[in-house]
Amino acid sequence: MKTKVINFYGGPGSGKSTKAAGLYYKMNMAGFSVELNNEFAKECVWEDNVPMLKDQLFMLAHQHRKILRLVDKVEYVITDSPVMLSGIYRELYNGPLYSDLIDKLAKECYDKYDNINFMLDRPKKIFNQNGRAQNEQGSIDIDNAIIEMFKSEKLPFFWLKGLEEEAVDIAFKYVAKKGSKEQWGKYLF
């Protein structure tokens, strides 16, 4: 079994964690071999350790380890903190601590898996700063940087729009279309 990684992309406050958890719930309840990896960066923010976010080598290693330990144990890993975000965040915190070799290392980690990439449409609601290092404008800037990264790296992605439940249903159907007919057939309609 080759592990597939389902990546939820978007700046802080875009709904990555909520939609990733929703897709995990839906796939798990349908009987699929799936695990949810949470965002290590958010753990750092909750611990008031925002300076740790500057060390993107550490952040990348920690986040990738969460995926690597599940390889060949589950068919799907869902993450709200894709490894490719290390290249985006490496420049944000008072200049880069590392060179663009971090970007290359992140791409090497990314290329180890079959990836499904969802870019989230930013919800039209009041931005909640709680648990985030960026403000709303900083988060929108990250959204834009992610789109540029998709283009420059030529990474395929599906733009996921809609309210929480609707977006989770769309993601579920999209993943189903990427899976085998035997496994997903009854979920496609």
Regions found by a protein language model. Give the residues of each.
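The conserved Walker
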Residues: P12
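Phosphate-binding P-loop
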Residues: M1-T3
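Conserved substrate/cofactor phosphate-moiety recognition/catalytic segment
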Residues: A21-R65
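Conserved lysine of the Walker
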Residues: K16
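Active-site flanking residues adjacent to catalytic metal/cofactor-binding acidic residues
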Residues: N38, T79-S81, L120
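Hydrophobic anchor at the beta1->P-loop junction of P-loop NTPases
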Residues: F8
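Conserved nucleotide-sensing/catalytic segment adjacent to the nucleotide-binding pocket
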Residues: N49-Y98
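A glycine- and Lys/Arg-enriched "phosphate-lid" helix/loop adjacent to the NTP-binding pocket
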Residues: Y93-K173, G179, W184-L188
